[in-house]
């Protein structure tokens, strides 16, 4: 499968594309995962979406298959402002070379390599390439411990910021995603295949 992946500021996307993204997020977060997130008119939208984030949208033809949100850590972001307990008392990152990844949503597809679908692996490669090309050193993200294990198996180099804690119905953990080591690992894996 070859997807069209676009990473751009919110204002670069058409209203229909944003509607599709927020609808997909509602379907995944409230519908499939059972998270307590605000859903308005069938769309999952939060205050961080008003901060001019960048989004990654993944399309297979005309169909939106997945998305990711990217926010700089110099302003408000989820780990710092919604899940500070996951920092274990540490100062939240505030650095132009560290951005937060959040709101990863994907249409379900069968698992492929390392427990992730081919589409997920493509999106990971694209988000790491984006950071590498922009000179970012790390992403910060909040995820589940199950996804953390899958990321590591897939070659994503992560560092825990704090200890795992219960957040809603999940066991969550805050992670740094180390860009250069991950870039090298993914590139080496690509050469080996």
Q: At which residue positions do the language-model features occur?
A:
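Short amphipathic alpha-helix that is part of the acyltransferase structural core
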Residues: 1-47, 55-57, 64
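Acyl-donor binding region in acyl/amide transferases
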Residues: 78, 84-172, 181
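Short, charge-rich binding segments
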Residues: 47-50, 57-63, 89-95
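Short, His- and charge-rich active-site/binding loops that engage polyanionic ligands
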Residues: 61-91
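Short acidic (Asp/Glu) patches
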Residues: 39-45, 49-52, 77-89
